[in-house]
């Protein structure tokens, strides 16, 4: 455990940031699974929205977002 004030603060910030990032990542994964199960256009657009939101917030990178969208589109088309 940190003894220095700035390290205590940094740990607190890191825990808070981890919670936010983890929940958003989880929301993206959940929406992707729903879309793969239902294979509907409505769910596909919701998944795109979640992926784009995570991309804008820096949760995932551009290449991963493109890859996820591509794979989802292929899955729904089949």
Swiss-Prot record:
Residues 21-34 have a biased composition (Polar residues). Keywords: Ribonucleoprotein, Ribosomal protein, RNA-binding, rRNA-binding. Residues 7-20 have a biased composition (Basic residues). One of its GO terms (cellular component) is ribonucleoprotein complex. GO terms for molecular function: rRNA binding; structural constituent of ribosome. It comes from the Bacteria. InterPro entries: Ribosomal_bS20 (IPR002583), Ribosomal_bS20_sf (IPR036510). SUPFAM superfamilies: Ribosomal protein S20. Signal peptide: none annotated. Pfam families: Ribosomal_S20p (PF01649). One of its GO terms (biological process) is translation. Residues 1-34 are annotated as: Disordered. Belongs to the bacterial ribosomal protein bS20 family. NCBIfam families: S20 (TIGR00029). Binds directly to 16S ribosomal RNA. This is Small ribosomal subunit protein bS20.
